[in-house]
């Protein structure tokens, strides 16, 4: 099962952020209650604090039979992990065939990123190359340069660019950059402008080519996220 996308149809995703098995089981109950609103799961492994329970939790998550992105978010991109944590989490989960894709940050050293991508591709995982600017939305030229550089990475199957909107105009510029990119390239791209100014990017991003919109179960994992059921309803209305 690979992540597959249709132009103009944004899929919904939620982030699992459990620290241990009990957390995981509680979140899985919520997911089952809201499963109709969820297309994709993301497992934020940088929150995990119980190494001995990792594979047990993984089997429970995999049993949901939803496409799963494995993510280790480092402090560089607003998460809790270090670059050294990638292999610690990804290696055993890939070996156990948990999930369909791994997230690799663009800020990782190129050699490490390539080695991790190679590990994933050998087991038929997709690689989501991501970048998160937790301060601003860069100027238009920088946005385009970033997207072109990520597109040119031969290890990347999917792309994700998140910026921080300091005004509604920032969101408009990111959506325009998304549209320009997706008209030129076939590689699936997900973008979002974080903050309250960027909520529109999560609702209308699909009309500009964005592939995934992230909502939340209980607590937002990024500023400006909407509850997953509300998000699914808005997307369904807009994409009808």
UniProtKB/Swiss-Prot annotation:
CDD domains: DHQase_I (cd00502). Pathway: Metabolic intermediate biosynthesis; chorismate biosynthesis; chorismate from D-erythrose 4-phosphate and phosphoenolpyruvate: step 3/7. One of its GO terms (biological process) is 3,4-dihydroxybenzoate biosynthetic process. 3-dehydroquinate binds at residues 15, 42-44, 73, 202, 221, 225. Involved in the third step of the chorismate pathway, which leads to the biosynthesis of aromatic amino acids. Catalyzes the cis-dehydration of 3-dehydroquinate (DHQ) and introduces the first double bond of the aromatic ring to yield 3-dehydroshikimate. Coiled coil: none annotated. It comes from Latilactobacillus sakei subsp. sakei (strain 23K) (Lactobacillus sakei subsp. sakei). Pfam families: DHquinase_I (PF01487). One of its GO terms (molecular function) is 3-dehydroquinate dehydratase activity. Its EC number is 4.2.1.10. It catalyses: 3-dehydroquinate = 3-dehydroshikimate + H2O. Keywords: Amino-acid biosynthesis, Aromatic amino acid biosynthesis, Lyase, Schiff base. The active site is at residues 132, 160. Homodimer. It comes from the Bacteria. This is 3-dehydroquinate dehydratase.
